[in-house]
Amino acid sequence: MNTRNTRSKQRAPFGVSSSVKPRLDLIEQAPNPAYDRHPACITLPERTCRHPLTDLEANEQLGRCEDSVKNRFDRVIPFLQVVAGIPLGLDYVTRVQELAQSSLGHTLPEELLKDNWISGHNLKGIFGYATAKALTAATEQFSRKIMSEKDDSASAIGFFLDCGFHAVDISPCADGRLKGLLPYILRLPLTAFTYRKAYAGSMFDIEDDLAQWEKNELRRYREGVPNTADQPTRYLKIAVYHFSTSDPTHSGCAAHGSNDRAALEAALTQLMKFREAVENAHCCGASIDILLIGVDTDTDAIRVHIPDSKGFLNPYRYVDNTVTYAQTLHLAPDEARVIIHEAILNANRSDGWAKGNGVASEGMRRFIGQLLINNLSQIDYVVNRHGGRYPPNDIGHAERYISVGDGFDEVQIRNLAYYAHLDTVEENAIDVDVGIKIFTKLNLSRGLPIPIAIHYRYDPNVPGSRERTVVKARRIYNAIKERFSSLDEQNLLQFRLSVQAQDIGSPIEEVASA
């Protein structure tokens, strides 16, 4: 799909250096064993794969964080396996509680255990509760981390403004492999002006985003935050699609049938529609900047589609960070930075299918350059922990729970949760359906229930906001139970309902389902 015009007789460059049109519409094929090693390092077998721009300290901290969070979830099933072998009867509750405290770090509600002598093991209920407790602990851990990184957030806001953006609104696919997009893949801290909402297939809600844009612009006008409305900065909307280089027709985007071309074009079309909506709904030159990013979920390397001088994007005009990684691996840090920024300019100068109208603005090029540099650390993160490519059990789906609603912005780790953003089940049924489909294979096939965390945020400054948010969470809870009644009747859906004030890091407040 070319958003500018059709050049049916011209060939498109592959990446930024080849004149061969990339195969976006892939045919059925088996996993490619040639990708067992990271493609950026495959030509350098004699060298340790460590890029000169990699932030080793950050990688170590992120690794410890990922291990500690996932370990809480991964302890649940081994705990249940031991519980299943404990004889039912008088000592059952005491033995299970002692085991829970030593294995999970907490005890269990008495009602999950007290009727064991007549009803047997309540393994499904215990699984749901233990998973919810692991999520609570993860949220608290990330909240502490966010509070300790306030200086990084302030620096990020300053960087956005220097690049000409007063807000950055990111809509990745809801796939759990993109759950760590901000802190890991892009290395961007959460700020009050960084918005992230995930949707199946990156198909974000244009009306919701238009309302977010209006709210942001009104705040600039009324409060001068983060800058005043007369400053020549823009609202940046980013859509993020994903693909798999090792198994493109099976491990790509589930919402688009693992069709890379469909995933890319759908995200690009949504971006164009959103920009048109802003321009049509508001006068006086109102508009936004848009950016499209692809993520290889095998390696976490990004592909950034470069806008031209008019802000138009093109499926074939991009910088592949796997290529820039290999090109700059042996250089000094300053030399590597120069090559990366030259790659952006070279993409803008592409001919054929990738040809655009001039180069992107200086601020946009600077922003893209920093994303590419940040992502080099993530490429090395995967190299150091997994040999350059995630193992087979993590290349596909390996989520621990379904997150429904506004999501837990604090908790962002790969393959931790499948995210379904919705206000009503009817409006976003596909998001929930895709999640249930994924967990049918992950959990139901093993006899495990599906943990569903329904979570919404409220504005504490608005009277009655919390009460209405609780009602909303309960309405969604009942709607999901009704939509998947056969699973619910078998106790195969384990719910946790909670609400939270809008401020990042605010306490999680669990609420009853009725």
Swiss-Prot record:
Parts forming coiled coils: none
GO BP annotations, alphabetical order: carbon fixation
**InterPro entries assigned to the protein according to its UniProt record, in alphabetical order:** Carboxysome_shell_carb_anhy, CsoSCA_C, CsoSCA_C_sf, CsoSCA_cat, CsoSCA_N, CsoSCA_N_sf
List its uses.
Expression of 10 genes for alpha-carboxysome (Cb) proteins (cbbL-cbbS-csoS2-csoS3-csoS4A-csoS4B-csoS1C-csoS1A-csoS1B-csoS1D) in E.coli generates compartments that resemble Cb, contain RuBisCO and have its catalytic activity, showing it is possible to make artificial, functional Cb using these 10 genes. Cargo proteins can be targeted to these organelles. Artificial Cb assembly in E.coli requires csoS2-csoS4A-csoS4B-csoS1C-csoS1A-csoS1B-csoS1D (but not the gene for carbonic anhydrase, csoS3).
**Catalysed reaction(s)?**
hydrogencarbonate + H(+) = CO2 + H2O
Mechanisms controlling activity: Carbonic anhydrase activity is inhibited by ethoxyzolamide, dithiothreitol, cyanide, and divalent metal chelators dipicolinic acid and nitrilotriacetic acid.
Q: Name the domain of life this protein comes from.
A: Bacteria
State the EC number(s). 4.2.1.1
Residue segments, region Catalytic domain: 151-397
Give the matching Pfam families.
CsoSCA_C (PF08936), CsoSCA_cat (PF20686), CsoSCA_N (PF20687)
Q: Any note on cofactor binding? A: The fourth ligand is a water molecule. Binds 1 Zn(2+) per monomer, in PDB:2FGY a second Zn(2+) is seen, but one of its ligands is an accidentally introduced mutation.
Keyword annotations for this protein, in alphabetical order, are:
Bacterial microcompartment, Carbon dioxide fixation, Carboxysome, Lyase, Metal-binding, Zinc
Annotated compartments = Carboxysome
* Cofactor(s) demanded: Zn(2+)
Using the UniProt annotation, give all residue ranges assigned to the region (C-terminal domain).
398-514
Catalytic residues identified in the record: 175 (proton acceptor)
List residues binding Zn(2+): 173, 242, 253
- What does the record say about the knockout? Cells do not grow in normal air but do grow on 5% CO(2), called a high-CO(2) requiring phenotype, hcr. Loss of CA activity, requires 3.5 X more inorganic carbon for half-maximal CO(2) fixation. Carboxysomes are approximately normal except that ratio of CsoS2A:CsoS2B shifts from 1:1 to 2:1. Required for growth in ambient air.
Where is region (N-terminal domain) located?
1-144
Q: How does activity depend on pH?
A: Optimum pH is 8.0-8.5 for CO(2) hydration, and pH 6.0 for hydrogencarbonate dehydration.
What the entry says about domains is: The N-terminal domain is physically isolated from the rest of the protein and may serve to anchor the protein to the carboxysome shell or to RuBisCO; in PDB:2FGY the N-terminal domain binds Zn(2+) which is thought to be non-physiological. The central domain bears the catalytic Zn(2+), while the C-terminal domain is structurally similar to the central catalytic domain but cannot bind Zn(2+).
Q: What does this protein do?
A: Reversible hydration of carbon dioxide. Essential for chemolithotrophic carbon dioxide fixation, supplies CO(2) to RuBisCO (ribulose bisphosphate carboxylase, cbbL-cbbS) in the carboxysome. There are estimated to be 40 CsoSCA dimers per carboxysome.
Quaternary structure and interacting proteins, as annotated: Homodimer, may form filaments.
Q: What is this protein called?
A: Carboxysome shell carbonic anhydrase
Question: What phylogenetic lineage does the species belong to?
Answer: Bacteria, Pseudomonadati, Pseudomonadota, Gammaproteobacteria, Chromatiales
